[in-house]
């Protein structure tokens, strides 16, 4: 076999494999469109580095924690972190994958964060996966017009401590990479959960 023939065969095989890869990525995008996204929960809530367990209130804080909270109120800084968990259900017979996801989170209608999670996510065929979205914010900066008591109570409401509910809104837009190009889901997917 001539060198030219070998080169052409290698070229055609390589192109064929590349186009198969592109077709596979297109199929994954189609599968992603068929997936459903549902708000699952909020967990791993921390305020000033204090773990807020379910139903915890200010009266559950020890003396050291109360001093830290008083200092934070004086400085008007209340860092809070938590995870928003989303159920992604894949009804397809093959896996659905995303390379990254834009998201917008609101608390009681106020935008907390608008950013991108760059972790790749793979949802196996005919199954569900829970995607945890880490959130970090400062409640004093976010709710600057509110009283200190209302702002502190909001952190505890996230942990389910109050009869007054907190409305958590989430919009997500997943992406998939096709032939090196990032393609976005057609629109943001909106979810909402009232925590009480």
State the predicted function of each range.
Residues 1-8:
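Bacterial N-terminal signal peptides that target proteins for export
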Residues 16-19:
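C-terminal motif of bacterial Sec signal peptides marking the signal peptidase cleavage site
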Residues 21-24:
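Bacterial signal peptide processing site
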Residues 40-77:
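Post-signal-peptide N-terminal segment of Sec-exported extracytoplasmic proteins
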Residues 79-84, 169-171:
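Short, solvent-exposed loop/turn segments enriched in Ser/Thr/Gly
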Residues 88-95:
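Asparagine-centered strand-capping/turn motif at beta-strand->loop junctions
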Residues 107-109, 113-149:
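Intrinsically disordered, low-complexity Pro/Gly/Ser/Thr-rich segments with frequent PxxP/GP/PP motifs
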Residues 139-196:
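Terminal connector regions
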